[in-house]
């Protein structure tokens, strides 16, 4: 009996316990979930490795158990379900990562940000942006400057042959069509090109081809490269508003010239003097009209300037007003003041460019001896020197009137005995860009004390630039080279010996084929000096004593700011028939440096520097097709001077209408191609640019343009976007 009671009590106790457990579970399930904010905050701060607390909430366990109980899945089904959930979660995570991240391309150059591109862009992204822009950005050639160079070398790349970088594009020809009338559309069948045989004049009122918008100065390339595309796209709209061709130092000149250039010439690549002095590169270029020669032997080592005319536009201009009436005479001596004003005269042009500071360190050390000489220098001596100079300037020389016949017009050169118009002694100290002045060493010869004093007064101190080649002259007579050399000429012609140091301007190996080394030895007085020298490659005529002295003194006076005296020396050298003097004096006439501006007479002197005998046979009738060249090696690496720069300047004169009634693109292109055949790199690039664009007088020829660009690229020109010139369809040979 007692045993049964115990069994029943035990069973009842178990049942009651089960009921209480179920009741507790139901109450817990019906009660609201506890707030686990404290636990969640604690989980983020502490680790539960040594704790008995669970990081999983009771609610999640309860919900999972209820779902599994309702599904009644087996163990295998549960595993399959968990794997499917994991795969779906991984797929969604990968899709999100692919849309938000991609490969990063790091550019090694400074000031170039990292470029991030999406490999698999979403359809919405493609619709939001232009598809062509994405494709162009993903191309590797858009990040290259030229050839196979990476974009990291954009800022560091400096061309060795040309002053400019040229924008070369295959299909861009909007500039030509933007300035034409609707009835002049060349796509129509009724359009007829002008007849070039009738006086070489177009009948459709042509606008001159604006080639300046397709080239940029290398000194400004790294500043303008980020905004190059945007400025080039907006340049067409700015052409209509720019009547006077005004530009700023931060924009590329894109203005077009519809009338011939007057005395106010354009400044296509205008920037400040500080930028010019800090960014000027000099090397062994043979490309320039801006090549100014410090001495006679410098012709094969010119400055890296493409054109004198372009150089005048590269400096910042100074607008003179009527209020500028306080003259300060520029002194060749070094002064403490860094500024000077310019006097406006009747013969002075409205726009005068200021010279930049020389971009090299010159030895201009003042010694106490020089200051003592200035202290004890009497006014009588100064007046005497000035009187000698004036009397020498009026000394009689050979008088003749030269007549040059070019393009059917007789260009009369003035008599060489006529003096230069005395316009004003206070002209701007501009003309040719400042070149390094080389130090000349005179061989020690027995002289009297009076001769030494004369030489010290007549010869100014010269600075020496170590990075350029040195020129040393030896003179047999100490009186040769003085200011009185015109009146003390000897009957025996004198040829100074020139010795050039084999130092390349580009830091490269010297070109032995174009250098002439003079080995000379001086013996005792009374013995004959033995010399051994090869013939100079680019100087067919020997330099006469008068010619070399005039050119050297003219350049020295120009550095001292004596523009009128410098122009007078150049004119006297022209009387001797010096081709270099023709080039320099013609450029002086073009820009009004020391003489009155005369564009037509300037063209005559530039023509004389080219040594062209028959204009029709040697220029107009000459068909130079670069596609027919047997080999690019036939074109010399160094252009002959001053012939090539003179041809280039004549081409620029015809393209811009300097010295004629209207621009003539056909004749200008003929001059450029002739200069390009001689190795002038800028002429090659401009010839290709002109042939790549359609104009009023010709159709564009991309094959011919690509041929010129390939030659220029091989010679060291910097071409932007030049991948297309090596396509197979542009490599075909032209008709012979």
From Swiss-Prot:
Highest rank taxon of the organism: Eukaryota
Comp. bias regions, Basic residues: 374-385
Biased composition (Basic and acidic residues): 14-24
Low complexity composition bias: residue spans: 238-256, 285-294, 303-318, 335-350
Misc remark: Present with 377 molecules/cell in log phase SD medium.
Any one Gene Ontology cellular component term annotated for this protein: cellular bud tip
Disruption-associated phenotype: Rescues temperature-sensitivity of MPT5 deletion. Partially suppresses the hydroxyurea (HU) sensitivity of MPT5 deletion.
Annotated InterPro entries: Mitotic_Regulator, Sel1-like, TPR-like_helical_dom_sf
SS bond list: none
GO BP field: negative regulation of G2/M transition of mitotic cell cycle
Protein's UniProt name: Protein DSF2
Region (Disordered): 1-46, 178-208, 229-410, 440-461
Biased composition range(s): Polar residues: 1-10, 25-46, 197-208, 264-284, 392-410
Protein source organism: Saccharomyces cerevisiae (strain ATCC 204508 / S288c) (Baker's yeast)
